[in-house]
Amino acid sequence: MTDLTSLTIAEARAKLSAKEITAVELTDAYLGAIEAANETINAYVAVTPEKAREMAKASDARIAAGNAAALEGIPLGIKDLFGTEGIHTQACSHILDGFEPRYESTVTQNLWNDGAVMLGKLNMDEFAMGSSNETSYYGPVKNPWRAKGSNLDLVPGGSSGGSAAAVAARLCAGATATDTGGSIRQPAAFTGTVGIKPTYGRCSRWGVVAFASSLDQAGPIARDVRDAAILLKSMASIDPKDTTSVDLPVPDYEAAIGQSIKGMRIGIPKEYRVDGMPEDIEALWQQGIAWLRDAGAEIVDISLPHTKYALPAYYIVAPAEASSNLARYDGVRYGLRVDGKDIIDMYEKTRAAGFGQEVKRRIMIGTYVLSAGYYDAYYLRAQKVRTLIKRDFELAFQAGVDAILTPATPSSAFGIADEDLASDPVKMYLNDIFTVTVNMAGLPGIAVPGGLDRKGLPLGLQLIGKPFEEETLFKTAHVIEQAAGRFTASKWW
């Protein structure tokens, strides 16, 4: 019998429907894989075997009764940012020590309503602040990929590193993730998986721990494009509890898979050619262009002139919002509390002990740019730049471009505890150079594996679409996937 953990969601769905396997068997296969590998990979910060088996049994009963829902019996991993009722939800931060919410996030509730099974909570950068999953209170996640002939442990990307590593190492059928500046697309690119950041407002933010509220968006990481489409259909919904949720029906994304892209116009932005970009990345981009041209798409050069300002503007806007959002963690109602001589002392000691170094850095930056003397010079100017970035994309789309193709990341995965990056936070921030524009403009973006670099590590291509045209991204990404093939890490763990 095939190893059940090697099945895609679509394949598992077919076998469950045909009663060739049961949801309990599938869930047990994943729980066994987690038990064997998690000590090494560190993808999960909490595993919920009893809950998983109980949900799988209920799925088997519904399948037997002919009442199977869209994700019936499919075992998923949930990023630790999503509120899961009565289960560890700590945003991988010490300050939320012991926190178990009394509510369920809208996205996870949608998944459970569609019959999905929860395997546990996935590791991530603390409060989703990071590009390498090294800022987690629970330690770094190891990428299931290694360079040819090397034993060096690599990062899986961030902040959704646990989600990407778990999918790549087959420790779940698919995973939820979030993306504020690239936190779905960059880890997907580093691990040879598919990740989509939907349009801002497509998935509810209710019950998801906030980082930067005007940028945060939930989405799936999956093994292939079809699985990502299946997951997004279940995750997305209109939600009156989230004021930024957009009242548009959720299409059947899976129906877009396999559609022709003949006649589509694909924009290639000249500003994405950055100094020092590895030859492998440039070659992959050219290969992606050739694949889409061969499939009948028209390739057009475009300009997004304000791209160069996106990263500095992002690292003003996001920390400013984080500084406001994270002010609520004070040790009074929940999470960690460090006693002090008075309430102010208690606040200071709790926050000093509870937040990690990178989170403290971003709170400090955010508080600084919002302070009276600097608000106009930094925050207001960054918001104006954001408007210009959005306008660049609008003009490109108005000129007839259907989607935009770029590299997903400026490099392949790098080593854990890389000294060069550890000593210079700005170098780490540069990992987001190709992804932040999409969040600043609120657009959908998908990362799809395009090939391996000369070290044998996966590289991703990014497609950027018009607002709420995720179907265009899925059908175009599927063309790339068909041409490039799928990539699986050789097991060393």
From Swiss-Prot:
Pfam families: Amidase. The active site is at K79, S159, S183. Its EC number is 6.3.5.7. One of its GO terms (biological process) is translation. PROSITE patterns: AMIDASES. One of its GO terms (cellular component) is glutamyl-tRNA(Gln) amidotransferase complex. Belongs to the amidase family. GatA subfamily. PANTHER family: GLUTAMYL-TRNA(GLN) AMIDOTRANSFERASE SUBUNIT A, TRANSAMIDASE. This is Glutamyl-tRNA(Gln) amidotransferase subunit A. It comes from Rhizobium meliloti (strain 1021) (Ensifer meliloti).
